[in-house]
Amino acid sequence: MKRVLLCASVAFAAVALQLPQIQPKDFAAQLQAGGDKPVIFHVGFAVLYRSKHIPGSEYAGPASQPAGLESLRAAVSKLPKDREIVLYCGCCPWDKCPNMKPAQELLREMGYTRVKALVIPTNFAKDWIDPGYPVELGEAAKK
């Protein structure tokens, strides 16, 4: 039984890691290039968003909490289902983040087809701010 559970959890983790992703370097280049920009949602904690965040990103709140998921649901409900959406948090490595998976699952269930996770290998400061990618200085999170 333990082997079955272990195999199931490993398989589940592998599926989670196969979700569409974008690397910080590629996303920064996309933001700086001309053309259509994706809608960007910060699905993490308010303290991180208030400190520094990706320019143009909207604060949805922690997707690990019902209020954060409802905020994200309301924010995307006006968007076309084929609109490009990028989610990020930055509290910890993205594959261990308590906020990324619930946010992606919600958008998938709602029928959004172009949702990506910004891969933050360590945290937002180290993987986005330190390399010099664009940030906006702290703005009060509305949630």
Residue ranges and their predicted role:
Residues 13-22, 50-87, 91-143:
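Rhodanese-like catalytic fold shared by cysteine-dependent sulfurtransferases
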Residues 30, 44-55:
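Extracytoplasmic strand-loop-helix segments at the start of, or within, the mature domains
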Residues 36-41, 81-84:
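Short coil/turn segments at beta-strand junctions that form active-site/ligand-binding loops
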Residues 24-29, 45, 71-74:
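A generic local structural motif
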Residues 3-13:
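Sec-dependent N-terminal signal peptides
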Residues 39-44, 57-60:
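Short hydrophobic beta-strand that contains or immediately precedes a catalytic carboxylate
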Residues 16-34:
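Short N-terminal segments immediately surrounding and downstream of signal-peptide cleavage
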